[in-house]
Amino acid sequence: MRLLLALLGVLLSVPGPPVLSLEASEEVELEPCLAPSLEQQEQELTVALGQPVRLCCGRAERGGHWYKEGSRLAPAGRVRGWRGRLEIASFLPEDAGRYLCLARGSMIVLQNLTLITGDSLTSSNDDEDPKSHRDPSNRHSYPQQAPYWTHPQRMEKKLHAVPAGNTVKFRCPAAGNPTPTIRWLKDGQAFHGENRIGGIRLRHQHWSLVMESVVPSDRGTYTCLVENAVGSIRYNYLLDVLERSPHRPILQAGLPANTTAVVGSDVELLCKVYSDAQPHIQWLKHIVINGSSFGADGFPYVQVLKTADINSSEVEVLYLRNVSAEDAGEYTCLAGNSIGLSYQSAWLTVLPEEDPTWTAAAPEARYTDIILYASGSLALAVLLLLAGLYRGQALHGRHPRPPATVQKLSRFPLARQFSLESGSSGKSSSSLVRGVRLSSSGPALLAGLVSLDLPLDPLWEFPRDRLVLGKPLGEGCFGQVVRAEAFGMDPARPDQASTVAVKMLKDNASDKDLADLVSEMEVMKLIGRHKNIINLLGVCTQEGPLYVIVECAAKGNLREFLRARRPPGPDLSPDGPRSSEGPLSFPVLVSCAYQVARGMQYLESRKCIHRDLAARNVLVTEDNVMKIADFGLARGVHHIDYYKKTSNGRLPVKWMAPEALFDRVYTHQSDVWSFGILLWEIFTLGGSPYPGIPVEELFSLLREGHRMDRPPHCPPELYGLMRECWHAAPSQRPTFKQLVEALDKVLLAVSEEYLDLRLTFGPYSPSGGDASSTCSSSDSVFSHDPLPLGSSSFPFGSGVQT
């Protein structure tokens, strides 16, 4: 060590180094890393204040150690030496000095240089050319070189043809001395992405251009122009964006294939599905009922073995473990999307296990065995047939219904098969789809409600006689909700009544409605409890209709809560009773948004996608606690009528993200888009999004990148948050965790003195009026500058991880 320090002292005392005076650029960088040299000449580099520095010596894996003024640099910090690299985040005056790089385990000098302080990058003295003041002898000791491609093999793919919605990345990795710069052109014109929906990402250190969610208007010739003082080079990429053509799923020919297996073996049936829109996939097994595989109408009886929809994992492979003779038969892979259905079938043949003694026996013994086996099998079959007929008659007298797991499908509709699987009950699953005929014609999937014997779940079952039903609160998608008094909901106080809400089916409900209500009940069991969601309190499943008991929100949904508390204004036309509580304060509005974000963050952590987040689906308790409702609904997203209003007059499409609207893709990030619309509802005090905009026109406006304008009196920071939620690229939207953090900062920054909306907002003029408004698309509801908008003050935007 002493020898090393002594050597450093000698090296640092050598006078008269040649000078390297570099212009202020994005980064001081020597690329590629230099190989070890025994005679590395000392040099000087002039670095502008605030300029990042990255120097390297040796190969990346075995680079040398960096020293400054005899002290070895640590691998972390603002100035660090790491894997042969010297990195300075932002050059400061104290960073000037002598730097050495020595090879690992030897005294070989890889780099010997002095960094001196130059002018600041922010200097505005542009009257003189700094090159004119440099002495020619102070040039870089390395020869100048025109730009050249460092990885031409990565640029061989000249034509990029991709479907709309994909991400495209063009790379032009280059080097030269001095370090070249890169510019991008589209069809011969400078390209900065300012007019492109979603913008672009320029990664200069990677020499790349990235465009997410490409559309047909992105077609063209993209040119990377790399240049320095010595020369320039360019390369052209051709981009063709293929429009999405509506088509039903395409199944690969020959799959699934006919398969033969031996009893006890494992079988895999493969079904390769190609679909632009998100497909539903089902595996079906054809079965026999009463000796027939088909019903009177000619459609087959099938059993649903495996199903996947938008939120399920891939099911293109059907696994059959330890097959038996009963597994033999016909299997069908059924795939469907919003356009139509496709299916292909295959046969599975199951052979008995081979007996090794069978092949070694003499021919005479074989014939004897055949006769014995045949006689015994025939006798056994007769006995089983008689026993089956007797048992069938006995069961027919008690339960005149076909087996519960059997369906007879008409034209293979995409019917769901629900199971009672609760993490809390621990009971085995039982099918909820009885043996009835399903028809794909008409909105009512099944006519006539049947009763199902649901298993008792002791953790959730509530005595029916301790529930007193009250007046109706409203109607949902498939049932009604009534207010009720539950006695003994708290076991410690058996005689105390608690106000609850009870979900039940309407009189004209169908089998599908019952399955949906049971599905919602099971989802709520699995989701668990949180302060900002409607929690399940109990269920009544025995000896009567199904009741799902949930928390009651006394102040109704958030939209009506906001509208009832609007300050008076000449243009206000209230559609409900005015609240006596008076106008809401600004911190209360932010708190509403914060609570909803917390509830959605919890649902996201439980892998639950809401798909219909809006102010109408957020309920408000007596203590002004926001609770997200209807997160457990089983929505048929592939059969949404985009031009049909809901029962309360709202158009669901106005809350839907573009990828959900156009491609039926629902994710947590599409819920984030809906949260941005909900924010707009909050700060317009219950306004209707896109007032007066026809649905057909809304589609084209969203495609062009138009977004709603900032509501009156909404702070720019919160409007910036809305615009972040409405980013065209789902991956660039914030997560709910980030939204919670951002809104929490807003709450902390708000003064303790509440701001009266009478003073802050002034007389209310509902720019977000009712859907009956007659304003045109040219009104101020839209901001006509495409995304991305001006910067938001929140710490996310580009590069958000989902």
Curated annotation (Swiss-Prot):
<dbReference type="InterPro" id="IPR050122">
    <property type="entry name" value="RTK"/>
</dbReference>
<dbReference type="GO" id="GO:0005783">
    <property type="term" value="C:endoplasmic reticulum"/>
</dbReference>
<feature type="domain" description="Ig-like C2-type 3">
    <location>
        <begin position="249"/>
        <end position="349"/>
    </location>
</feature>
<dbReference type="Pfam" id="PF13927">
    <property type="entry name" value="Ig_3"/>
</dbReference>
<feature type="topological domain" description="Extracellular">
    <location>
        <begin position="22"/>
        <end position="369"/>
    </location>
</feature>
<feature type="domain" description="Protein kinase">
    <location>
        <begin position="467"/>
        <end position="755"/>
    </location>
</feature>
<keyword id="KW-0812">Transmembrane</keyword>
<dbReference type="GO" id="GO:2000573">
    <property type="term" value="P:positive regulation of DNA biosynthetic process"/>
</dbReference>
<keyword id="KW-0964">Secreted</keyword>
<feature type="domain" description="Ig-like C2-type 1">
    <location>
        <begin position="22"/>
        <end position="118"/>
    </location>
</feature>
<keyword id="KW-1003">Cell membrane</keyword>
<keyword id="KW-0418">Kinase</keyword>
<dbReference type="GO" id="GO:0010628">
    <property type="term" value="P:positive regulation of gene expression"/>
</dbReference>
<comment type="similarity">
    <text>Belongs to the protein kinase superfamily. Tyr protein kinase family. Fibroblast growth factor receptor subfamily.</text>
</comment>
<dbReference type="GO" id="GO:0055062">
    <property type="term" value="P:phosphate ion homeostasis"/>
</dbReference>
<feature type="modified residue" description="Phosphotyrosine; in variant R-388">
    <location>
        <position position="390"/>
    </location>
</feature>
<dbReference type="GO" id="GO:0043235">
    <property type="term" value="C:receptor complex"/>
</dbReference>
<feature type="glycosylation site" description="N-linked (GlcNAc...) asparagine">
    <location>
        <position position="311"/>
    </location>
</feature>
<dbReference type="InterPro" id="IPR011009">
    <property type="entry name" value="Kinase-like_dom_sf"/>
</dbReference>
<feature type="active site" description="Proton acceptor">
    <location>
        <position position="612"/>
    </location>
</feature>
<feature type="domain" description="Ig-like C2-type 2">
    <location>
        <begin position="152"/>
        <end position="240"/>
    </location>
</feature>
<dbReference type="InterPro" id="IPR036179">
    <property type="entry name" value="Ig-like_dom_sf"/>
</dbReference>
<feature type="region of interest" description="Disordered">
    <location>
        <begin position="119"/>
        <end position="148"/>
    </location>
</feature>
<feature type="glycosylation site" description="N-linked (GlcNAc...) asparagine">
    <location>
        <position position="290"/>
    </location>
</feature>
<dbReference type="Pfam" id="PF07714">
    <property type="entry name" value="PK_Tyr_Ser-Thr"/>
</dbReference>
<dbReference type="GO" id="GO:0043085">
    <property type="term" value="P:positive regulation of catalytic activity"/>
</dbReference>
<keyword id="KW-0325">Glycoprotein</keyword>
<dbReference type="InterPro" id="IPR001245">
    <property type="entry name" value="Ser-Thr/Tyr_kinase_cat_dom"/>
</dbReference>
<keyword id="KW-0067">ATP-binding</keyword>
<dbReference type="GO" id="GO:0005524">
    <property type="term" value="F:ATP binding"/>
</dbReference>
<dbReference type="GO" id="GO:0042632">
    <property type="term" value="P:cholesterol homeostasis"/>
</dbReference>
<keyword id="KW-0732">Signal</keyword>
<feature type="binding site">
    <location>
        <begin position="473"/>
        <end position="481"/>
    </location>
    <ligand>
        <name>ATP</name>
    </ligand>
</feature>
<feature type="modified residue" description="Phosphotyrosine; by autocatalysis">
    <location>
        <position position="643"/>
    </location>
</feature>
<dbReference type="GO" id="GO:0030133">
    <property type="term" value="C:transport vesicle"/>
</dbReference>
<dbReference type="GO" id="GO:0008284">
    <property type="term" value="P:positive regulation of cell population proliferation"/>
</dbReference>
<dbReference type="GO" id="GO:0005794">
    <property type="term" value="C:Golgi apparatus"/>
</dbReference>
<dbReference type="GO" id="GO:0005576">
    <property type="term" value="C:extracellular region"/>
</dbReference>
<keyword id="KW-0967">Endosome</keyword>
<dbReference type="InterPro" id="IPR007110">
    <property type="entry name" value="Ig-like_dom"/>
</dbReference>
<dbReference type="InterPro" id="IPR020635">
    <property type="entry name" value="Tyr_kinase_cat_dom"/>
</dbReference>
<dbReference type="InterPro" id="IPR000719">
    <property type="entry name" value="Prot_kinase_dom"/>
</dbReference>
